[in-house]
Amino acid sequence: MKQLIILVIVLIPFSGISQKKNSYNSIVKEEFIFTPQSEHSHGSSIVALPNGDLLVTWFQGSGERNADDVRIMGARLEKGKSEWSKPFLMADTPGLPDCNPVLFLNNKNKLFLVWIAVQGNRWEGSILRTRTTTDYKKSGAPVWEWQDNILIKPGDEFVSEIENQFDKMPGLHHGWAEYAPLYDDMIKEASKNQVLRSIGWMTRIKPLILSSGRIILPLYSDGYNLSICAISDDDGESWKPSKPIVGRGPIQPALAVRKNGDIVAYMRDSGDSPARVHKSISKDNGESWSYTVKTDIPNEASVELYVLNDGRWAFFGNDLNDGRYRLVLMLSDDEGETWKWKEYIENDDKQGGGSYSYPSLIQTDDRLLHITYSSRTSETEKSIKHVVVDTDKIR
């Protein structure tokens, strides 16, 4: 994804993180889902099925938005087995790249696959697509029962919210300080285009499903360089847009619910330097969001967030400003105010190290945390990695 204008790079150390890998000896298992190979394999999502199977999806091909052979792939780890199935096709739109798949179950245990088909080989032309089924318990790929596009139409509230939130944001004194007003005005003006604001919304992270059954699917736009959510109150039959999550570069939201009902979004930084995770809060079940503020967590790639069954929050991402050679799992017992426990899952040297990114998290009934992410150690060694962590050991 693009960076816009970067004038100054300020590297601020993220204090308190040990540089050791697996210091708590919490890793139960780590494996490649398929043998590393040369095709680009990226953007995984994992779901635990009711029968105990694990299902993973990712996109794979000769590139990303510019490669029309990119398709959505998947693999299954059947309950009681130790090896993943051979990869199988999950979706392939003829003549278009398919990217950024997300898997989830609604409250009725219907399986959803949501992804983007990239029109015109531009992220801004992406269309949200979905497949659903209840026939997913057998070996191999799910048998899809329905396919459709997810169309959302942000209205005049989109325009007014962008204007109001940018006006509320404090000025900058570094990085984009000179250009921020021009940038803000550019986004305000672009928001008035009804066509542009109706397309180009992309998936990355699984949705948040509230106790009410409401599905909040986080989306982002490479054109507007900000985020939004698609909301469904009928188990995914229909969708409406939230108000935008406004900031200078907050994309790819990951969501978690506080005990008081507030929803917190952590987002990748696609804005000014230094790159830090953005944070926004919704107090009305995802309908509207505060303008984003930067946390002190370094990160310029996709992040994940998950509330564990012991109440702690899990954050996973690259705590770096200069690459993807390190991945950290951080745990919090105060809903993200502080991160007391930190465990490195990947920790290579910058020079000659691998690239690890775009994670997905779930916790299974046995309390184990399952993590999938993209792994590239050379141009001929690309795969999706699966790591199982016993978070009870991280204390």
Each language-model region and where it sits:
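Asp-box/BNR beta-propeller blade signature and adjacent active/binding-site loops
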Residues: 19-395
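Sec-dependent N-terminal signal peptides
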Residues: 4-13
